[in-house]
A protein has these predicted regions:
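Conserved SxxK-family serine transpeptidase/carboxypeptidase catalytic domain
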Residues: 90-93, 369-467
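Hydrophobic membrane-insertion alpha-helices, especially the h-region
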Residues: 73-89
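Active-site-adjacent loops and short helices of periplasmic peptidoglycan-processing enzymes
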Residues: 93-265, 272-281
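A penicillin-recognizing enzyme superfamily signal
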Residues: 281, 285-374, 382
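Solvent-exposed coil/turn segments that connect beta secondary-structure elements
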Residues: 128-130, 159-160, 174-178, 224-226, ...
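Short Pro/Gly-enriched beta-strand edge/turn motifs at strand-loop
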Residues: 105-106, 304-313, 414-419
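Short Gly/Pro-enriched turn/cap motifs at secondary-structure boundaries
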Residues: 113-115, 197, 314-319, 425-426
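Terminal targeting segments of Actinobacterial cell-envelope proteins
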Residues: 1-70, 74
Length: 467
């Protein structure tokens, strides 16, 4: 064919290829890319195949499907809250307590009393449950004569108690007690006539010791109780230590020996202890008795029966001078106040009259200085019940409270729960405890009552309880 390039035709023929006519021969297929790269023409004419579909979901994969946290934890929280509420509601309630709201002490107005103390020796005055009213002189051990018999009687009654109205055990009189009656009369001792083989009641033997101050009977009781006077004296000193009588030494049961020494302060301690025994107090206050022989024996303490004096014991000797351990009881609006005092070493003649007169002057001035004050009035709020969970219920005095004291004295107030404890619930006006003013036997106690209804703690209080 004229004009056709002979080179191209020769190449086709030499390769042995034949060209088939194509209806779309207007489009020429592009050669494959080299080196695995796709050209722009490839991208335009032959787009890449779609990605393969994901593999089917397995059961393990399904377990890892995310879960809503609210759905997981809400039931747990609700369960814990329910358990908490149940536990709080069922926990044992704390024991209710009484709390005092008025002042815990009361001070009497006025000045401390100025008392007529003796010009010699030593003296001490105390009010039972209130404390020391005053003291005079150096508290050093001095002979106390027959005041020692207070300890003798106290030890006998401690070792061999007597019921009120009874006479106690039987004490057989020995030969020594009979002989000491005769020798005692010769030497000017206080003695009572007895005969060996006689039987004295324990009560009558103590009467002989406390009223006519019989030395021979004091020694008889010592031998009867302990087997010997020396053994009994050891008991006396042991009891003295128990009572805190550290400046006291007993060397005989009668007090005749000047080596039996004590102080006014120590004897007042013994007086307080001894007067707690009703039989001792009865003996100490007797003015006379009739003995086994029909003789009337007098108490040498002439103060008994006047000026509220109820005891206790005299003692006199040349070495000791005049000595007296005394007690008085005065009634203040229905409350009995015991006052115990001791005066030692009064040597002005007549020594017994001197100590009795000076003691009476001192005692009566002391009793005049005592007064009764209204500390709390009926209906006054004195405290509250604390239920332990924040609840409070007022507590009121059911009557006036009067305390005994003297100028400047401070007495203590306390609010005490009943023995079986404070209840969790009670109606208004129910007794709920005791208000105490003072201490020991002179303390005044009145019941206190609820000012309004006492209710058990509410569910809300139980729920919010932390402790």
């Amino acid at each position: 064919m004229t004009g056709e390039s002979p080179g191209r035709a020769d190449q086709q023929e030499s390769s042995g290829e034949t060209t088939e006519p194509n209806e779309t021969n207007s489009a020429v297929e592009a050669p494959a890319p080299t080196g695995g790269r796709r050209t722009l023409l490839d991208e335009l004419t032959n787009p890449p195949p779609p990605p393969p579909p994901p593999p089917p979901e397995t059961e393990e994969a399904a377990d890892r499907t995310p879960v809503n946290p609210l759905k997981t934890w809400l039931p747990v929280v609700l369960l814990l809250a329910l358990v908490f509420c149940v536990v709080q509601a069922l926990r044992p309630l704390p024991a209710p307590t009484l709390k005092l709201t008025v002042a815990s002490s009361y001070t009497f107005g006025g000045e401390r009393p100025s008392l007529p103390w003796p010009a010699e020796g030593q003296a001490v005055l105390e009010a039972e449950g209130l404390g020391r009213i005053g003291a005079f002189g150096e508290q050093r051990p001095v002979p106390i004569a027959s005041v020692a018999k207070v300890m003798t009687a106290y030890v006998i009654l401690r070792d061999h108690p007597i019921e009120q109205g009874d006479t106690g055990k039987t004490v057989e009189v020995d030969r020594k007690a009979e002989d000491q009656f005769g020798s005692g009369q010769t030497e000017g001792e206080s003695v009572v006539k007895v005969t060996a083989g006689q039987e004295l009641s324990e009560y009558e033997a103590l009467e002989a010791v406390m009223l006519p101050s019989a030395n021979n009977i004091a020694r008889l009781l010592a031998r009867w109780d302990a087997g010997s006077e020396a053994a009994f004296v050891r008991k006396m000193n042991a009891v003295a230590r128990e009572l805190g009588m550290h400046d006291t030494t007993y060397t005989d049961p009668s007090g005749l020996e000047a080596t039996t020494v004590s102080t006014a302060s120590d004897q007042v301690k013994l007086g307080h202890a001894a007067m707690k025994d009703p039989v001792f107090a009865e003996l100490a206050g007797k003015t006379r008795y009739t003995d086994l022989n029909g003789d009337v024996q007098q108490n040498v303490n002439r103060l008994l029966g006047s000026g509220d004096v109820v005891g206790i014991k005299t003692g006199s000797s040349t070495r000791a001078g005049g000595n007296l351990l005394f007690a008085a009881v005065r009634d203040f609006d229905g409350t009995e106040q015991l006052v115990v005092g001791a005066m030692l070493g009064q040597h002005k003649a007549d020594i017994l009259d001197t100590v009795l007169g000076r003691s009476d002057t001192l005692l009566q001035a002391t009793l005049r200085a005592l007064a009764s004050d209204t500390v709390v009035r009926k209906g006054e709020t004195v405290g509250y019940v604390d239920d332990g969970l924040g609840g409070r219920t007022e507590v009121m005095a059911t009557e006036d409270v009067r305390a005994i004291g003297w100028g400047g004295l401070k007495v203590r107030l306390s609010l005490d729960a009943p023995r079986n404890g404070v209840p969790h619930a009670a109606p208004a006006g129910a007794p709920i405890g005791t208000l105490t003013v003072g201490d020991a036997d002179s303390a005044v106690k009145i019941p206190v009552a609820l000012g309004r209804h006492l209710s058990s703690p509410s569910f809300g209080s139980k729920l919010t309880r932390l402790g």
